[in-house]
């Protein structure tokens, strides 16, 4: 089942962050949008694996 993610860019630190609102505490970050998307997908997988 796909999960919604919220992706944000912070120009002050030149980094992206992502959270999954459906999974409390599931968050990640990265230098590029692509890296951040990959990181949050891995975080979601790990979150569900340990739930």
Give the label of every model feature segment:
Residues 1-14, 19, 23, 38:
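N-terminal segment of the canonical double-stranded RNA-binding domain
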Residues 9, 25, 48-50:
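Generic detector of low-complexity/intrinsically disordered segments
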Residues 15-17, 29, 46:
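Extended rod-forming repeat segments used as scaffolds/tethers
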Residues 24-35:
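A short, exposed loop/beta-hairpin motif centered on an aromatic-Gly-Thr core
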Residues 38-51:
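A short N-terminal helical cap/helix-turn-helix that marks the beginning
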């Amino acid at each position: 089942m796909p999960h919604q993610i919220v992706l944000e860019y912070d120009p002050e630190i030149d980094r992206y962050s992502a959270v999954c609102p459906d999974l409390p505490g599931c968050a990640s970050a990265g230098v590029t949008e692509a890296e951040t998307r990959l990181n949050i997908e891995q975080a979601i997988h790990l979150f569900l694996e340990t739930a």
